């Protein structure tokens, strides 16, 4: 909600969307808070405590992250929107939504527990969703009884990154204690390098964010498109959609379309917000809130997209190239057949679809697909959503990621 207050803003620094991923209870939210505390000590941002990040009553009651939370901070070189993702397997759909908006990720791994199930699945999902750069932060270093474990853990993490297609030999892997760094900054909010080793380790992580994550190439000249991540009701203001602009740019007063689920809706941009600040224009990569004319809870929902008029349509039938993960990759153990109905993840939406026919690139049609196979498939979703050719998606079933695909053709269903 902080993104929806008032202040004129024009960002002059390079903007990146980064986030924390990793297994449940390994310290992602604490690390997010520690980063803001250290940067606040330098004078670049406002500090955020854990309970201000996991801010919903449900999260406070359960003492765990459930939703993706957005935190703003700046370094000397860059402006960041930080997406703190849930690590529990039950909320993997929210994690996918967060990662789909990131330019790079910080993988948090407990030094005590080492890499766990969601550590590996989050690395896999980051790769499938197009993340090319991951930094690793081995947290809870202070809780280790034997410091000689660290070199072995670091080497293990490098091998895991390589297995999933990341440059593990060169990926930065840093160690520290987010909790002790946060406690030190709460006790003395002024940052002084060399005064506290745990604070210095967070400072080093921040430096690596600036140095290691490449500047993203934004699609500024493409038609405007923003997937809706959340819809928030602001009292005396109305419904505000939040999300990250995928491509193009948008100005206050411009006409847009709301596409997905039902008939396309026409609207106009009333207000643009980025965290605490009002924008006149927002561009690709910006993490914003947008207030549109004439919206209600029926025509303005998570999973829809806001787009330049006449540039995207809703579809529920398409042909896709699909790879089904092997068991060793975390995928299925057994084949599936025509009529299989898993969950498909596109941008910010999770939707059930039916796989109606299968065909090998060489070898013709088949009625059964084995783990490890690459096929073409016709898929019908249970309702239409905004789709385009060459869009990537993730397939999940029963709590496991089982495949990845790319849309080849969009199909109109004949009446």
UniProtKB/Swiss-Prot annotation:
Swiss-Prot/TrEMBL keywords: Chloroplast, Elongation factor, GTP-binding, Hydrolase, Magnesium, Metal-binding, Nucleotide-binding, Plastid, Protein biosynthesis
EC number assigned by the record: 3.6.5.3
Compartmental location: Plastid, Chloroplast
Residue ranges of every copy of the tr-type G domain listed in the record: 13-217
GO molecular function: GTP binding; GTPase activity; translation elongation factor activity
UniProt-annotated binding residues for Mg(2+): 29
Region G3, annotated ranges: 84-87
Catalytic activity reported: GTP + H2O = GDP + phosphate + H(+)
PROSITE patterns cross-referenced by the UniProt entry: G_TR_2
SUPFAM superfamilies: EF-Tu/eEF-1alpha/eIF2-gamma C-terminal domain (SSF50465), P-loop containing nucleoside triphosphate hydrolases (SSF52540), Translation proteins (SSF50447)
Sites where the protein binds GTP: 22-29, 84-88, 139-142
GO BP: mitochondrial translational elongation
InterPro entries from the UniProt entry: EF-Tu_GTP-bd, EF-Tu_GTPase, EFTu-like_2, EFTU_2, P-loop_NTPase, T_Tr_GTP-bd_dom, Transl_B-barrel_sf, Transl_elong_EF1A/Init_IF2_C
GO CC term (a single one): chloroplast
Annotated region (G2), positions in chain: 63-67
Pfam family, one: GTP_EFTU_D3
Region (G1): 22-29
Chain intervals for the UniProt region annotation (G5): 177-179
Cited CDD domains: EF_Tu, EFTU_II, EFTU_III
Domain of life: Eukaryota
Residue span of region G4: 139-142
Function field: GTP hydrolase that promotes the GTP-dependent binding of aminoacyl-tRNA to the A-site of ribosomes during protein biosynthesis.
Family: Belongs to the TRAFAC class translation factor GTPase superfamily. Classic translation factor GTPase family. EF-Tu/EF-1A subfamily.
Remarks, miscellaneous: This is a very divergent elongation factor, it is probably no longer completely functional.
Name of this chain's protein: Elongation factor Tu, chloroplastic
Organism phylogeny: Eukaryota, Viridiplantae, Streptophyta, Coleochaetophyceae, Coleochaetales
């Amino acid at each position: 909600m902080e993104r929806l207050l008032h202040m004129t803003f024009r960002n002059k620094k390079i903007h990146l969307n980064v986030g924390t991923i990793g297994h449940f209870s390994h310290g992602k939210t604490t690390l997010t808070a520690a980063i803001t505390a250290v940067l606040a000590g330098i004078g670049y941002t406002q500090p955020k405590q854990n309970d201000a990040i996991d801010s919903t009553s449900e999260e406070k009651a359960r003492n765990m992250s459930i939703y993706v939370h957005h935190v703003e901070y700046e370094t000397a070189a860059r402006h960041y929107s930080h997406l703190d993702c849930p690590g529990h397997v039950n909320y993997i759909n929210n994690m996918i939504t967060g990662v789909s908006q990131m330019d790079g990720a910080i993988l948090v791994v407990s030094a005590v527990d080492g890499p766990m199930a969601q550590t590996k699945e989050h690395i896999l999902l980051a790769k499938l969703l197009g993340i090319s750069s991951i930094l690793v932060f081995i947290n809870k270093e202070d809780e280790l009884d034997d410091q000689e474990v660290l070199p072995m853990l670091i080497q293990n993490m490098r091998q895991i990154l390589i297995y999933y297609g990341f440059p593990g030999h060169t990926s930065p892997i840093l160690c520290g204690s987010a909790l002790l760094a946060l406690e030190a900054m709460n006790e003395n909010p002024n940052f002084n390098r060399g005064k506290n080793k745990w604070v210095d380790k967070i400072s080093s992580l921040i430096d690596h964010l600036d140095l290691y994550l490449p500047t993203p190439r934004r699609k500024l000249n493409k038609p405007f498109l923003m997937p809706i991540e959340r819809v928030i009701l602001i009292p005396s203001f109305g419904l505000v959609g939040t999300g990250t602009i995928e491509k193009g740019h948008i100005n206050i007063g411009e006409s847009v379309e709301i596409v997905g689920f039902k008939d396309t809706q026409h609207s106009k941009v009333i207000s643009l917000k980025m965290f605490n600040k009002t924008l006149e224009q927002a561009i690709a990569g910006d993490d914003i809130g947008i207030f549109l004319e004439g919206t209600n809870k029926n025509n303005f929902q998570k999973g829809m997209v806001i787009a330049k008029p006449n540039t995207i349509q809703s579809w529920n039938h398409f042909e896709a190239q699909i790879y089904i993960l092997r068991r060793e990759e975390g995928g299925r153990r057994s084949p599936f057949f025509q009529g299989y109905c898993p969950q498909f993840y596109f941008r910010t939406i999770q939707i059930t679809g039916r796989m109606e026919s299968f065909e090998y690139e060489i070898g013709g049609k088949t009625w059964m697909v084995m783990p490890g196979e690459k096929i073409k498939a016709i898929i019908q979703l249970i309702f239409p959503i905004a789709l385009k050719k060459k869009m990537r998606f993730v397939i999940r079933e029963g709590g496991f990621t089982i495949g990845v695909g790319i849309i080849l053709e969009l199909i109109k269903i004949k009446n």
